[in-house]
């Protein structure tokens, strides 16, 4: 089944992008997972990432790695829903937690940001160390989509690590996305949601690593947070240096791994014209439904899974391509 099959049509009562984005986080459905194996991956002398594995029971099962968005973790409903559907389809599924996220709170001396492609590489290498004869497919959601695309552009000479990649609603221009979230009326609703999660992560960091640079807890917006914590903690000269070096738009031209970008034209955080204004390699397939919001994609029709979660369906469908 091709990725273009079952084109997205929004639910008739959830038409606009903000509603799609909000409702995409509601009606969570069954997110109960079978037993998971936990891995703690050391990424530096004071930092560990928590990685969960859903075993398929099939030694020949293909591997899919899922990476969450900002404010999320392996426990986010969309990660668990998609992981379960992939597992039912027979995949071996890994769900990573970035620094300071989920069960990884307090296990790293600084929090993750939109440019931690080195961490993603270490997770990929760890998984392939467990299963050296297998290939891996990687799905990055939202901010992890930016990280994934950055990684692929940086590692253009190492395509054998990843068979293919999918970035879902990636904010490839971090500065622009930050300004939208921090400065616009439509963005502030979501900004406040993200900041609550970030402040919890910051408190866990300060409690576990006294004396290290930690968020003050007074940051009101994503932009404030990036200025006062993200950039200095990651040793960038300033926030513009962080945005410039970590925005995936600067790496798309160098990607050699077959890559799909799924991003709705009405995404409230990721402006659609950004993809037309940057150079993209021929390895990238851009899939841009007219509607869907930011990781919403609540469909008007039932998917083959019996729900209205078009994003879930597309990720699982994409994972199964070339394997039938």
Kindly label every feature range from the protein language model:
Residues 17-58:
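N-terminal cap/lid segment of alpha/beta-hydrolase-fold proteins
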Residues 61-69:
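Short beta-strand element of the alpha/beta-hydrolase
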Residues 78-95:
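Short amphipathic alpha-helix adjacent to the substrate-entry channel of hydrolases
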Residues 255, 261-263:
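Short beta-strand/loop motif that positions the catalytic acidic residue
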Residues 292-324:
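Catalytic active-site module of serine/aspartate enzymes centered on a nucleophile-bearing elbow/loop
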């Amino acid at each position: 089944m091709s990725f273009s099959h079952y084109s997205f049509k929004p639910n008739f009562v959830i038409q606009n992008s903000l509603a799609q984005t909000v409702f995409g986080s509601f009606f969570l459905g069954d997110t109960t997972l079978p037993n998971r194996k936990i891995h703690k991956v050391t990424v530096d002398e004071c930092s560990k990432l928590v990685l969960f594995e859903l075993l398929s029971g099939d030694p020949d099962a293909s591997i899919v790695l899922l990476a969450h968005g900002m404010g999320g973790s392996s426990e986010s409903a969309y990660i668990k829903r998609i992981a379960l559907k992939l597992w039912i389809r027979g995949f071996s599924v890994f769900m990573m937690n970035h620094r300071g996220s989920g069960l990884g709170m307090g296990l790293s001396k600084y929090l993750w940001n939109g440019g931690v492609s080195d961490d993603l590489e270490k997770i990929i290498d760890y998984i392939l160390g467990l299963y050296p004869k297998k290939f891996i497919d990687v799905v990055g959601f939202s901010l992890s989509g930016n990280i994934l695309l950055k990684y692929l552009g940086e590692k253009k000479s190492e395509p054998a690590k990843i068979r293919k990649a999918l970035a879902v609603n990636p904010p490839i221009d971090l500065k622009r996305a930050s300004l939208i979230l921090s400065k616009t009326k439509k963005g502030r609703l979501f900004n406040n949601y993200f900041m609550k999660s970030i402040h919890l992560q910051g408190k866990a960091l300060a409690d576990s690593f006294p004396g290290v640079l930690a968020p003050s807890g007074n940051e009101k917006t994503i932009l404030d947070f990036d200025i006062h914590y993200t950039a200095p903690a990651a040793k960038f000269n300033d926030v513009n240096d962080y945005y410039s070096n970590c925005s995936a738009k600067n790496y798309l031209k160098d990607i050699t791994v077959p890559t799909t970008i799924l991003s709705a034209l009405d995404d409230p955080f990721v402006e659609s014209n950004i993809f037309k204004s940057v150079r993209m390699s021929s390895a990238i397939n851009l899939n841009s439904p007219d509607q869907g919001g930011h990781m919403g994609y609540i469909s008007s029709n039932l998917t083959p899974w019996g729900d209205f979660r078009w994003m879930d369906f597309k990720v699982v469908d994409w994972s199964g391509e070339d394997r039938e």
